[in-house]
């Protein structure tokens, strides 16, 4: 009770706004809003984590004792929903707040961690961890690390090493596991020791067709192209059709569609026989450049 009274009666002041401005994390949060369309639940969750870490930083300045906040994370969602981009921003936030020393992001998959024969996995995993120290290790499609149907698989060895480092060197490294939500849930069920070390779970929703159209416009502007009004409508229809097809990968699929539209635009211009071109000719994507996709020849179920 005495200790609590001392804390409550202590009139030491800390300036939250000053600390917030000093870390410049608002700059990263602004980038997140500008660079990623939609994803409101994700952005909200990242702001919540940033707020927790900022307050924890202030508490430590006043020597208020509390356990270190759990920083390891799980990003779940379909491909192309911005998981890697958000991981990069999270690494930047953690660095600015002083929770990691370097702030870099190292992205790996099973192949980078797991060997093909006895004695090969440990050196591979340890080398990756060495490279990731002081930053964030992003393990994409993490569920491939564990193969329950194969007792001789070496993935479990990599997981054991990860567990040790996540616990013993949590002040030097943050690990983010990523993948499809349903598979990640099974992965954690099979590895309870891993699940207990992951404090922050962030679910990435699929984009709507309207959001994907906004993303397409952002991508096309970055490459100094533009859509005609009719091309806008055609791309929206393309997106709605593509979302119903197998292997749809959100923004990644839209980027591929734009690349193909650019190729068709180039071929259209080349085939026209025009020898003198205007700037408008070179930057404009027409509806026909999208309509020639084989997707429009398929039944729209």
UniProtKB/Swiss-Prot annotation:
Transmembrane segments: none annotated. It comes from Porphyra purpurea. GO terms for cellular component: chloroplast. Keywords: ATP-binding, Chloroplast, Nucleotide-binding, Plastid. PANTHER family: AAA-TYPE ATPASE FAMILY PROTEIN / ANKYRIN REPEAT FAMILY PROTEIN, AAA-TYPE ATPASE FAMILY PROTEIN _ ANKYRIN REPEAT FAMILY PROTEIN. The gene is cfxQ. GO terms for molecular function: ATP binding; ATP hydrolysis activity. It comes from the Eukaryota. This is Protein CfxQ homolog.
């Amino acid at each position: 009770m005495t200790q609590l009274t001392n804390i409550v009666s202590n009139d030491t002041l800390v300036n939250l706004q000053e600390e917030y401005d000093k870390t410049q994390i608002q700059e990263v949060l602004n980038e997140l809003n500008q660079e990623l369309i939609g994803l409101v639940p994700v952005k909200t969750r990242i702001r919540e984590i940033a707020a927790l870490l900022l307050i924890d930083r202030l508490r430590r300045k006043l020597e208020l004792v509390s356990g270190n906040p759990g920083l390891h994370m799980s990003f779940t969602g379909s491909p192309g929903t911005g998981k890697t981009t958000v991981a990069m921003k999270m690494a930047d936030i953690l660095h600015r707040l002083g929770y990691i020393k370097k702030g870099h992001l190292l992205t790996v998959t099973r192949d980078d961690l797991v060997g093909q024969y006895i004695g090969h996995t440990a050196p591979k995993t340890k080398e990756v961890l060495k490279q990731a120290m002081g930053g964030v290790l992003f393990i994409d499609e993490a569920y491939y690390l564990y193969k329950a149907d194969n007792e001789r698989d070496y993935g479990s060895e990599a997981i054991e090493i990860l567990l040790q480092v996540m616990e013993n060197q949590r002040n030097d490294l943050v690990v983010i596991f990523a993948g499809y939500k349903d598979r990640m849930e099974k992965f954690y069920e099979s590895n309870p020791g891993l699940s207990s070390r992951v404090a922050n779970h962030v679910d990435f929703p699929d984009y709507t067709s309207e959001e994907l159209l906004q993303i397409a416009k952002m991508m096309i502007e970055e490459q100094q192209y533009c859509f005609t009004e009719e091309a806008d409508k055609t791309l929206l229809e393309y997106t709605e059709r593509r979302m119903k097809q197998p292997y749809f990968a959100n923004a990644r699929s839209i980027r591929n569609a734009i690349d193909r539209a650019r190729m068709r635009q180039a071929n259209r211009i080349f085939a026209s026989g025009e020898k003198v071109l205007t700037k408008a000719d070179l930057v404009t994507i027409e509806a026909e450049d999208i309509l020639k996709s084989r997707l429009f020849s398929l039944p729209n179920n």
